[in-house]
Amino acid sequence: MIYAVFIFNNKGKPRLTKFYTPIDESIQQKLIGDIYAAVSTRPPTACNFLESNLIAGKNRIIYRQYATLYFVFVVDEGESELGILDLIQVFVEALDRCFNNVCELDLVFKFQEIHAILAEVVSGGLVLETNLNEIVLAAQNQMPKTKRSNAMPFSNTLSSFATRF
């Protein structure tokens, strides 16, 4: 089960927080700070998995850094670490396709669309969809027509994504 999903910038400012388990808001704020501190202090050569007891007993923090953003999933021991890393990759690629070179400002100003894309991937702490084309299609169908017309074609997206990361 996925307990929470976070996106932080490199200064520790949360750009997306989604908890799939009920936790008091004061505890949520402490968890966000603790998770960012644990992830941001690790050297780039370190493994992207951390053992943790922060949420619901024993769990794992799985993260990946893209440019100035940390994408963090907190999961139970039953989830595959490599599967979650792939899920993070799919989520980032979906964001990149939907927002034409996604950046931190997209996360700030288009947070509803970001949450909608995340809801296509994860719901209630369970993975719903991993097919990138299905996720992008569902997300684009939810966006207003003006935003959809600005979406980048599929062939250009992968090449721009590969050069950015």
From Swiss-Prot:
The lineage of its organism: Eukaryota, Fungi, Dikarya, Ascomycota, Taphrinomycotina. It comes from Schizosaccharomyces pombe (strain 972 / ATCC 24843) (Fission yeast). PROSITE patterns: CLAT_ADAPTOR_S (PS00989). It is found in: Golgi apparatus; Cytoplasmic vesicle membrane. Its main location: Golgi. It is a peripheral membrane protein. Belongs to the adaptor complexes small subunit family. The gene is aps3. GO terms for cellular component: AP-3 adaptor complex; cytoplasmic vesicle membrane; cytosol; Golgi apparatus; intracellular membrane-bounded organelle; nucleus. Part of the AP-3 complex, an adaptor-related complex which is not clathrin-associated. The complex is associated with the Golgi region as well as more peripheral structures. It facilitates the budding of vesicles from the Golgi membrane and may be directly involved in trafficking to the vacuole. Keywords: Cytoplasmic vesicle, Golgi apparatus, Membrane, Protein transport, Transport. Adaptor protein complex 3 (AP-3) is a heterotetramer composed of 2 large adaptins (apl5 and apl6), a medium adaptin (apm3) and a small adaptin (aps3). InterPro entries: AP_complex_ssu, AP_mu_sigma_su, Clathrin_sm-chain_CS, Longin-like_dom_sf. This is AP-3 complex subunit sigma. It comes from the Eukaryota. Pfam families: Clat_adaptor_s. One of its GO terms (biological process) is vesicle-mediated transport. PANTHER family: ADAPTOR COMPLEXES SMALL SUBUNIT FAMILY (PTHR11753).
